[in-house]
């Protein structure tokens, strides 16, 4: 779809969406996302120029259908896939990608840490019409025996190779600095970001500053050549409620704000990653803090999980926090699956995580009163009142699940036109009863009254006592 758009920008000194937006140009990608979001293309251009919206769209990813991530757009969700050093299978990752696409993930991140990482990523990119993100330090680690052996040049080479392959956005943990890491020493769970922990160990062993920070301008130059979007990683995010909103988290966030402005000086797009595990009451404050420190760059949050006691159900604990975060300004939600904290998610875990987060994102869009956000809810409600079961299934977030649940107790085809489900049956279905009230159910109508005044309620042996 984008091949001709990309060809027209070939050879230009700066190809980024932000660069064109700041020059007053509405690119084809901007016009496309404006149509998808039902926004004025000029508003999209202004938001991209200001840095409040990003369109992750690497020139080397022509298969991509662009999307917008930002406060003016609908809330997006990301699904993580990728193998581990324990299990590696290209076909399984493509199955996961298929699940992501079928259930409506807006972006996908390949977090592979084992096997032939470039091959897995190449397959995902060539099959993905949605933006693909990565965490480059994972592949870097596959090239050395120990993280302490990483070199700045090796990091930059991997980043360049991934950009040239077509990766649309990359998590860069450039805010984990030597003077901030000790602030996490008193935490219950310490550093829970893999990238953050690896870089902390590298700095401790080498006695040098974070190479992603010291070479940030060089990374900007790479991103500028391909139009890769920064996803500034929160390497010091809290990993439990007790560690939330602490000194380390906000010290890193302040650095991420500085790096955001530095990337913008290169006309490179930026979104900022956020926590993590956060008590429900602290989420609005965390969203406000990011807006202040990072100049309203789109906030991309992992959950946050609002309780630590539910392994196996963390797609639920985190979706609760995600809905609140999105209501208060988060632009993209990184899903969590039932396998979180327990193991590598399979395709079914991926499906459950996506569905939970689609619900959270949609609930936030409704709460923020985005134009048209509630249209599907209202259409499904009308179908429900009309007992149009097939239409209800079609409008459902997960049609297969809705149909399966219904058919488990009423599998007959005749049940698809029945005015009841197996919960209430025909005698107790409130909507069926109401729909048969006739004229009395019309707006402004009054139900008919008996001519005589009601008699005092009685029971055998005398009148019922009246409570006072």
UniProtKB/Swiss-Prot annotation:
Enzyme Commission number(s) of this protein: 4.1.99.17
Q: Which GO terms describe its cellular component?
A: cytosol
The alphabetical list of record keywords is:
4Fe-4S, Iron, Iron-sulfur, Lyase, Metal-binding, S-adenosyl-L-methionine, Thiamine biosynthesis, Zinc
Show the InterPro entries listed in the entry. Answer: ThiC, ThiC/Bza_core_dom, ThiC/BzaA/B
Concerning Gene3D superfamilies, the annotation shows: 6.10.250.620, Radical SAM ThiC family, central domain
**Reported cofactor(s):** [4Fe-4S] cluster
Where is substrate bound in this sequence? 80, 109, 138, 173, 193-195, 234-237, 273, 300
One BP annotation, GO: thiamine biosynthetic process
Q: Where does [4Fe-4S] cluster bind?
A: 421, 424, 429
Which positions in this protein are listed as binding Zn(2+)?
A: 277, 341
Class of the enzyme per the UniProt entry, highest EC level: lyase
Q: In which pathway does it act?
A: Cofactor biosynthesis; thiamine diphosphate biosynthesis
> Can you provide one Gene Ontology molecular function annotated for this UniProt record?
carbon-carbon lyase activity
Catalysis performed (reactions): 5-amino-1-(5-phospho-beta-D-ribosyl)imidazole + S-adenosyl-L-methionine = 4-amino-2-methyl-5-(phosphooxymethyl)pyrimidine + CO + 5'-deoxyadenosine + formate + L-methionine + 3 H(+)
| HAMAP family per UniProt | ThiC
Its assembly, as annotated, is: Homodimer.
- Which family is it part of? Belongs to the ThiC family.
Q: What is this protein called?
A: Phosphomethylpyrimidine synthase
Protein source organism:
Anaeromyxobacter sp. (strain Fw109-5)
UniProt lists the gene as thiC
């Amino acid at each position: 779809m984008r091949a001709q758009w990309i060809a027209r920008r070939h050879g230009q000194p700066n190809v980024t969406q932000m660069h064109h937006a700041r020059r007053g140009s509405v690119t084809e990608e901007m016009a496309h996302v404006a149509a998808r979001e039902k926004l004025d293309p000029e508003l999209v251009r202004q938001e991209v120029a200001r840095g409040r919206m990003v369109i992750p769209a690497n020139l080397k990813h022509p298969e991509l259908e662009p999307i917008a991530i930002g406060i003016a757009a609908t809330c997006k969700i990301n699904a993580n896939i990728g193998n581990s050093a324990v299990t590696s299978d290209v076909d399984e990752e493509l199955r996961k990608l298929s699940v992501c696409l079928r259930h409506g993930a807006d972006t996908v991140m390949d977090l592979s840490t084992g096997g032939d990482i470039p091959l897995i990523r190449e397959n995902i990119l060539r099959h993905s019409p949605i933006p693909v993100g990565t965490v480059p330090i994972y592949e870097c680690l596959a090239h050395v025996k120990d993280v302490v052996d990483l070199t700045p040049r090796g990091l930059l080479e991997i980043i360049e190779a991934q950009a040239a392959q077509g990766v649309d956005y990359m998590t860069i943990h450039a805010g984990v600095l030597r003077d901030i890491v000790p602030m996490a020493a008193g935490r219950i769970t310490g550093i829970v970001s893999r990238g953050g922990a690896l870089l902390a160990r590298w700095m401790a062993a080498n006695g040098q500053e974070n190479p992603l920070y010291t070479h940030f301008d060089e990374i900007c130059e790479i991103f500028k050549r391909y139009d890769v979007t920064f996803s500034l990683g929160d390497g010091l995010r809290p990993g439990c409620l007790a560690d939330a909103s602490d000194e380390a988290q906000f010290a890193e966030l302040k650095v991420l704000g500085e790096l955001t402005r530095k990337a913008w000086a290169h006309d490179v797009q930026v979104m900022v990653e956020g926590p993590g595990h956060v008590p429900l009451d602290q989420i609005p404050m965390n969203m406000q803090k990011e807006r202040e420190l990072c100049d309203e760059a789109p906030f991309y949050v992992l959950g946050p999980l609002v309780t630590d006691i539910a392994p196996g159900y963390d797609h639920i604990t985190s979706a609760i926090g995600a809905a609140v975060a999105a209501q208060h300004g988060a632009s993209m939600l990184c899903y969590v699956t039932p396998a979180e904290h327990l193991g590598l998610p399979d395709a079914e875990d991926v499906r459950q995580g996506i569905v939970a987060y689609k619900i959270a994102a949609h609930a936030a869009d409704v709460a923020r009163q985005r134009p048209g956000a509630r249209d599907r809810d209202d259409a499904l409600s009308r179908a429900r009142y009309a007992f149009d079961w097939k239409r209800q299934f079609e409008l459902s977030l997960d049609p297969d699940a809705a149909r399966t649940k219904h058919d488990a107790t009423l599998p007959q085809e005749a049940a698809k036109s029945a005015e009841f489900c197996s919960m209430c049956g025909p005698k107790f279905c409130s909507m069926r009863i109401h729909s048969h009230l006739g004229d009395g159910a019309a707006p402004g109508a009054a139900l008919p009254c008996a001519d005589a005044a009601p008699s005092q309620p009685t029971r055998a042996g005398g009148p019922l006592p009246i409570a006072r």
